[in-house]
Design a protein with these regions (language model features):
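Generic beta-strand/beta-sheet core signal
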Residues: 120, 183, 191-192, 203, ...
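A conserved beta-strand->alpha-helix junction
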Residues: 74, 144, 149, 319-330, ...
Length: 489
């Protein structure tokens, strides 16, 4: 009998940052849940560990949550039939806080005195443990280990009567980066934190309105992009139309710069810029800053492709797909023996000897995190006969961890925090290594330079300058989280 077993991400040696979540909401469409499932499918790159949808049919809230990919869990008619109604919200998750268990699948749902509320959150609350400690002392019982549940409890204890006032009151207690969608019995609500670190856009299809993380999720259902939700803005969609509220003190925008480099899908429009175009511009700037004579430019697929194209166009060196990626390696594998695990990166990538042998190769990738993947890719390309290997990275050295909703290693695990560039080059086995400068990155995005007094983006993973207070991080060891549900579901 053939059996399948869980294949841990470490088995694939994927050394990348991971965004935590994607969110999607629909108001006023007869196929709200189906559109939400399609939207989540388009946002699958933002979270692959779990997905959930909650709908409202005018009388009842209905929910379906599952571990795994959207297509594996929301493609059947039976599932869609259990999610009736013209309003729905959905959520994809990659865990940065809390375990990957069914009880941690969003959207979360709770009954209040004003009615039901479902909520899905992309980001990270940086004072979650401090707030949780206070809430537990007040008698709150947590059903998950999600920081999102902090928001739910803060809404529950608010003394205001109106649901929006209660949400605003709750969010005034919260520090962190967040974009979220919520659903009540008569409204779809979307909002961004005052710095606008995480993305959220507004769209329309027929007479229905959409809120979602990226424009690629609008494209898949044929919806029209209307605009970005502004930092600190709450958008309320109801039968009365669309209402905008800006209840928070205005702050300088600090959108996550890594959305342009890696997280967002290349076909999305982010903050008014096409992501694919920005990545090509980054590659061109990288070529200007760190030219080296070579025979071919080879991207590390898939995330290195746009920057490699830009590098090739700027340097007039041939672009070749010298590495092929296997897109069908999932989260399970037939009998994952130690031998298979030791294959590591070769499960996903293979060098094309016919194009690499005897060539001076420039490898282009989006980032180096721990360096484990880069080291193995370089060894693979070297084994395919490359004469020289020069690596070019379309982001500055990643020297600091992210605490705003991105799954990153601790600083001591980041290669660039432990080594200078020459040592990194020796460690991963390349003839030369170069990263785009901070100035070059900002120029590629459309700025003249980085403003050191007031940076235009959140670039804390490169600069170490955190625009939102890290209350939990700076408060010492984090306490264990209290929950009645301690067993994994």
């Amino acid at each position: 009998m053939i059996t399948t077993h869980p294949l841990h991400p470490n088995d694939l040696e994927e050394d990348k940052f991971h965004d935590e979540c994607g969110v999607f909401g629909v108001f006023g469409h007869k196929d709200a849940a189906a559109h939400t499932a399609l939207g989540l499918h388009a946002l699958q790159h933002r979270g692959q560990e779990s997905a959930g949808i909650v709908s409202y049919d005018g009388t009842h809230f209905n929910a379906h949550r599952s571990l795994g990919l959207v297509g594996d869990n929301f493609s059947s008619e039976k599932v869609m039939e259990r999610l009736p109604g013209e309003v729905a919200i959905g959520h994809n998750r990659y865990a940065t806080t809390g375990e990957t268990t069914l009880r941690n699948v969003q959207p979360l749902f709770a009954e209040f005195d004003f009615g039901g509320l479902a909520i899905g959150h992309n980001g990270n609350i940086t004072n979650a443990h401090a707030l949780r400690k206070v809430l537990v002392k007040r008698g709150c019982i947590f059903q998950s280990t999600l920081d999102t549940e902090i928001i739910v409890h803060q809404i529950a204890i608010s003394q205001f009567s109106d649901v929006l006032d209660r949400m605003i009151d709750a969010l005034n207690q919260i520090q962190g980066a967040y974009s979220l969608v919520a659903m009540t019995e008569d409204a779809l609500i979307g909002l961004r934190d005052p710095l606008g670190v995480r993305p959220l856009v507004l769209g329309r299809i027929d007479r229905a309105n959409i809120l979602c993380s990226e424009t690629c999720a609008l494209d898949i259902i044929g919806a029209e992009y209307i605009r970005d939700v502004e930092p600190g803005e709450i958008v309320v969609v109801s039968a009365k139309g669309i209402r905008s509220i800006k209840p928070f003190n205005k702050k300088n925008k600090r959108f996550c710069i890594f959305e342009y480099i890696y997280f967002a899908r290349p076909d999305s429009q982010v903050e008014g810029r096409n992501v694919y175009d920005v990545r090509k511009c980054i590659g061109a700037e990288l070529a200007k800053e760190s030219h080296v004579d070579a025979d071919i430019i080879v991207p590390v697929p898939d995330s290195g492709v746009p920057a490699a194209i830009g590098y090739a166009e700027q340097s007039n060196i041939n672009f070749e797909l010298g590495i092929t990626r296997n897109h069908y390696v999932g989260r399970t594998f037939i009998e994952p023996t130690d031998q298979i695990r030791h294959l590591g990166v070769r499960l996903k990538h293979n060098a094309n000897r016919g194009y690499i042998e005897g060539k001076r190769v420039i490898l282009v990738d989006d980032s180096i995190v721990r360096g484990t993947t880069s080291e193995k890719i370089v060894a693979m390309v070297r084994a395919a006969g490359a004469k020289e290997i020069h690596m070019r990275i379309s982001s500055p050295p990643t020297t600091h961890s992210c605490y705003y909703g991105i799954d990153t290693p601790e600083p001591e695990q980041l290669l660039a925090s432990r080594m200078d560039i020459d040592l990194m080059a020796k460690h991963i086995g390349v003839d030369s290594l170069a990263f785009i400068s901070m100035r070059g990155l900002y120029r590629a995005i459309g700025e003249t330079d980085r403003n050191p007094e007031n940076p235009q983006y959140c670039d804390a993973c490169f600069s170490g300058e955190y625009p939102i207070e890290l209350t939990d991080r700076n408060g010492g060891p984090l306490p264990a989280q209290l929950s009645l549900l301690t067993e994994q579901v």
